UniProtKB/Swiss-Prot annotation:
Gene behind this protein: eIF3a
Annotated disulfide bonds: none
The protein's name: Eukaryotic translation initiation factor 3 subunit A
InterPro entries per UniProt: EIF3A, eIF3a_PCI_TPR-like, PCI_dom
Keywords: Cytoplasm, Initiation factor, Phosphoprotein, Protein biosynthesis, RNA-binding
Provenance organism: Drosophila yakuba
Region annotation Disordered: where it falls in the sequence: 588-631, 829-1137
Amino acid sequence: MARYTQRPENALKRANEFIEVGKPLRALDTLQEVFRNKRWNYAYSETVIEPLMFKYLYLCVELKKSHIAKEGLFQYRNMFQLVNVNSLENVIRGYLKMAEEHTEAAQAQSSAAVAVLELDDLDNIATPESILMSAVCGEDAQDRSDRTILLPWVKFLWESYCQCLELLRVNTHCEALYHDIARMAFHFCLKYNRKSEFRRLCDKLRKHLEDICKSSNQTTGVSINKVETQQLCLDTRLYLLDSAIQMELWQEAYRAIEDIHGLMALSKKTPVPKTMANYYQKLAMVFSKAGNQLFHAAALLKLFQLTRELKKNLTKDDLQRMAAHVLLATLSIPLPSAHPEFDRFIEADKSPLEKAQKLAVLLGLPQPPTRVSLIREVVRLNVPQLVSEDFRNLYNWLEVDFNPLNLCKRIQSIVDFIENGPENALLTPYIQSLKDVTIMRLIRQISQVYESIEFQRLMQLASFCNIFELEKLLVESVRHNDMQIRIDHQKNSIYFGTDLTESQREYRPDGPALQSMPSEQIRSQLVNMSTVLTRAVSIVYPNRERDQRAKLRTQMVNHYHEIKDREHQRILQRQKIIEDRKEYIEKQNNAREEEEARRQEEESRKAKLAEQKRLEQEQEERERKRHQNEIQAIREKSLKEKVQQISQTAHGKKMLSKLDEEGIKKLDAEQIAKRESEELQREAKELQSKLKSQEKKIDYFERAKRLEEIPLFEKYLAEKQVKDKEFWEATEKTRIENAIAERKDAVGQQERLKRMYPDRDEFLDALKKERASLYVEKLKKFEAALEAERKKRLADRIIRRREERRQAFLREKEEERLRKEEEIRLAQAAEERAAAEARRLEREAEDEKRRAQYEKQRAKEEEAERKIKEDRERLARELASERERTEKERDTWRPRGGDRPSAPSGGSGEWRRGAPTVNNERGIERGGDRIERGGDRIERGGERIERGGDRDRKDNEGADSSWRVRREPDSQRAAAPKDSGAPQSRDEKWRRGGERDRDFRNDGARRDRDDGPRRDRDDGPRRDRDDERSGFRRNDGPRRTEEPQRETGGNWRDAPRHADRENRRTAGGERRDRDVRETRGDQRGPAPKEAVSSGGGGNWRTTPAAREEKPATKRDQPQEKENKAADDGEWTSVKRR
């Protein structure tokens, strides 16, 4: 039985009715049933479905059913994503707008609730409950109110954003809407400070981007190769980066930067300068928050280069400010470690290098930058010349000048300038880094000037550093920069470079330097000595080097002339080898590319097939699950309706109260109905027992009560009668008094009104006199109008009646014509029916006549068949006795150890010695001929009837062409006398063999033996086929040759049979039989398999049959029954050899 489904507009009306009566859940269920129905998906337009969808989402928002809203949105997307994208966009935006409005309302309600709570009691602000709650949970009233009122709506809004993003992530038509919703979700996280949701949102968007980058064959799939898609994704990631920076989620900001760089690298179009500037600015901010001053400065330098090159309207102040920012960030980079920790302790670990390389890729640099390379690039870009005088001096003091005694004082002046200048607010974060770099420069320059220095003196030189910070920097310089520093706390002194056995690395440190350290001098002593000795030798022997060079040049020239031809050939041969190698490699590459292309094409084809198979399986699985879900939903709905129906009754509520929710889910509708019936029966039994006990109790109680109340009733009635009588008397007295008073008042009023009669009569007379003339005039006008209207209506009625009579006359005339036509048509139809009935009766009479003739013919044929069968049985018995007698004498005449002898050459036909041949042969021959004729009549009934007079054709083959005779081989035939006129026995004819036997089996059998249905073949006239059978056809009739008749001892077959054969068929019989054969086919059934006795009869039929020769009667009907009987099973019994 199909489920009842409502039309969408009817469902919307019903939902509105449920909402009006305060049942939003029922309204939502009604709309959800419509959305779950698959029949309406493509049957209605968006004008019908869109209002229903808005109502559906409104109910979902009101009830906070985000999962139900998701189901409806997915259904709506599948329906209209290719038809009307604007409708889908309006629905989704409306849904999110409703969710945001409810969330804002909840926030306002939460704040109002806290305000009311705070203003509740001004005298007792801190209640005991608030104190305990703050001590237990550490939250104030606003947090508790938000968690109770606001948090559910915030969660619902977050789920709505996630559902919409999941809904639109692969739809290219809704791509802009997808990115708008992503920005709305970022704003939501900022507004409500949802950091965990922001992280999940970033992961979700990153997963969506990975899915987009994968190849997709969907019709509505988003392609990352499109420029619009790349730009939208880039804008969304930039918004994500801004939101992450505002929420101080630096890890998410760094991941967003990686995504932005990947999108820019993927895009074939160069990003706009504004985007790149924003990218470098955010990247510098992230590096600054991460404490990576090196890459922060590199990002600012890239931003400066981009702005300087592409921004045409850049003012001098802006350029100066940006240059100062870049210069100060570069100078604030800590001095590089000469021996980093990962080189010293974990030299095999490449992760820091890989991380630096990865960060360099984000900046578009080929290799990680260094402090020296950045300062060199700053100088190349002429940045120190673009900044103000103070910052230019800062660069010179730190990187060019060597003045350790005044270094910190000079830097302090720059620091004061930065702190006091309001326009230098962006430079304030670099002050501490600048101080650390200054202290490190100071220590390095002091180490080149002094071997030792007092701690207090160094503190005076490092004015903006305390003793603890200074000692820490000294230790770090020893640890990271390989400086030789020793602190003597006892003497409160510091010693530099006193150990001559240790030195720095081979490269010199960057920055200004006065001289090398003593340890550096000891390390480079041999190098210096070699340099000085080389210079001395060149001074002592000034021409030696020139002579050596000339000698070496001469040797080189001679060597060249010796090897130039060989080298030339070698180069040519090498070039040829290179070309051959290139050709070989090209061929290999082409073959490899072709093979790879074929492999990829095969893999692609397999992948497509696998994907198609997977999609089909998923479709089948979805259909199966959907079917299961529908069945489950039907069951649940039926169970729910049954439970609701039962819960409306008292016994149902009682029965359901005994079951928990899990128990109800385990039951189906039948089990619940069964339990309900059991509960009803039990309650009925309890009620019957209670009623019986109650009946007995009430009976006793009522009887006792009535006995006791009888005297009380009598007393009460007597008192009541007295009271009623007194009440009636008092009431009647009051009524009489009131009636008398009313009559007196009425009489007085009548007397007063009688005095007004004369005045009334005078006023009426005067009024009638005044209005009499006006009345007469109006009456005349009215009568004139009445007369005119009467005449007009009479004229109209005459015209109308005349027209009605004319129309009635025309209508009657038309009806008369139609009636006559109908009568003519009915008469013609009756004549046709009578003619058809007469033809039908004629046909039935003819059919009945044919059936009677057919039945008569059938009875005659059955009688003939019965007689033939009896003759066959009699002859079979005679032949069986003859064979038994012959078998007894056979062994006497058979040669020893041999088989039957062949026919003697004399042609006498006697192959048994001493046996009476003539009589036996003649008797057997007669019996065989009778069998032959009887069987052949049945076998070839149709053929003999068809041939009729054609049997009198020429037959010159004599007895040798009989269809029973098997010819002897050529050798035996040659030895036999040709003119032996003695009659041969039938057994001898049968046993003559030779090549004719093979002809009979191979050729004759194929041509003439009827092994099955063959009359449907077109073999030409019957006469031609009979002529082809001359090799073994029956030839028992009179011959047309002049050969004398054999003496057969008065055989009855010697009589002429022409008349008999001529009378068997009429002139029309042959035509009718031919028609019968053409219509039904003269198919013969399979021959019965009967064993042929090997006795001396020589006949190949085992079932003899005798017949009476009498002329065939002429029949109007074809002999279908006779032919059918002959064909059905008695046409032959030949045992095939």
